[in-house]
A protein has these predicted regions:
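Basic, flexible Lys/Arg- and Gly-enriched helix-loop patches that mediate nucleic-acid binding at interfaces
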Residues: 1-187
Length: 187
């Protein structure tokens, strides 16, 4: 088991990005950005992937470029877990279709996992796990199978969980979680 010393290790922060914030460090339109969250942080941090402006949840920031590259490269197949609230009661055949793969305008895609969590009225909550990071992927997948996303939250990125982070806050990833993140990409 590897031990990472506090003063020698790179910085990895888990952020709960709120809806309405863009996943960049600057925005020409003046919208809230990730830079607003880390403005007082002594190190320069880079976002690992993105979440669209209408999606909330877990986003990682780091000063380790190699870690960021590996976490976002499809060959490492790092799973990302989303909870989506969609319109309608999801039919049983949708799971099979998503697991087998659907054709999107930028190529075929299959989810790693799909499960229905609950249905209340005309809203169904589903969990979707994918390892690719295409633009608005979960929203486009659910549109393709006929269930538009009403609300989308990323709850897990590899071994890192959102946990109880409030929107617009962050925590440092440490100890076993940090080691698991590096192990996931062979570093």
């Amino acid at each position: 088991k590897r031990i990472i010393l506090e003063e020698n290790r790179p910085i990895v922060m888990a952020v709960n990005k709120p809806v309405g914030m863009v996943s960049t460090m600057s925005d020409p339109e003046g919208r809230p950005t990730l830079a607003d969250l880390v403005a007082d942080y002594p190190e320069r941090l880079y976002h690992v992937g993105r979440l669209d402006i209408d999606t909330s949840g877990l986003l990682l920031l780091t000063n380790d470029g190699e870690l960021a590259n590996r976490l976002t490269h499809p060959s490492y197949e790092i799973p990302k877990t989303y909870i989506a609230r969609v319109h309608g009661e999801v039919k049983p055949g949708v799971r099979r279709r998503l697991l087998e793969g659907v054709e999107l305008e930028d190529g075929p895609i299959a989810v790693d996992s799909f499960r229905t969590m609950e249905t209340y009225g005309d809203i169904t909550t589903v969990e979707i796990i994918v390892h690719e990071g295409r633009n608005r992927l979960v929203r486009r997948l659910m549109d393709e199978v006929g269930y538009p996303v009403r609300e989308l939250v990323r709850t897990k990125f590899g071994p890192i969980r959102l946990e109880h982070l409030q929107p617009g806050t962050m925590r440092r990833v440490k100890g076993p979680q940090l080691a698991a993140l590096y192990d996931a990409v062979g570093l």
